[in-house]
């Protein structure tokens, strides 16, 4: 059981880190797009 946790935890941390790093720039780009749309109106 402990062995499983030792293996799964770093994988889970890596996946979470990758997802967070991908979402961060995407969210900034989305916010920029909304700002441009608001200025257009």
UniProtKB/Swiss-Prot annotation:
Keywords: Membrane, Photosynthesis, Photosystem II, Thylakoid, Transmembrane, Transmembrane helix. GO terms for biological process: photosynthesis. It is a single-pass membrane protein. It is found in: Cellular thylakoid membrane. GO terms for cellular component: photosystem II; plasma membrane-derived thylakoid membrane. InterPro entries: PSII_PsbY. Its main location: membrane. GO terms for molecular function: manganese ion binding. The chain crosses the membrane at residues 4-22. It holds the Pfam family PsbY. NCBIfam families: PRK13240.1 (NF009711). PSII is composed of 1 copy each of membrane proteins PsbA, PsbB, PsbC, PsbD, PsbE, PsbF, PsbH, PsbI, PsbJ, PsbK, PsbL, PsbM, PsbT, PsbX, PsbY, Psb30/Ycf12, peripheral proteins PsbO, CyanoQ (PsbQ), PsbU, PsbV and a large number of cofactors. It forms dimeric complexes. Belongs to the PsbY family. Loosely associated component of the core of photosystem II (PSII), it is not always seen in crystals. PSII is a light-driven water plastoquinone oxidoreductase, using light energy to abstract electrons from H(2)O, generating a proton gradient subsequently used for ATP formation. HAMAP family: PSII_PsbY. This is Photosystem II reaction center protein Y. It comes from Prochlorococcus marinus (strain MIT 9211). The lineage of its organism: Bacteria, Bacillati, Cyanobacteriota, Cyanophyceae, Synechococcales.
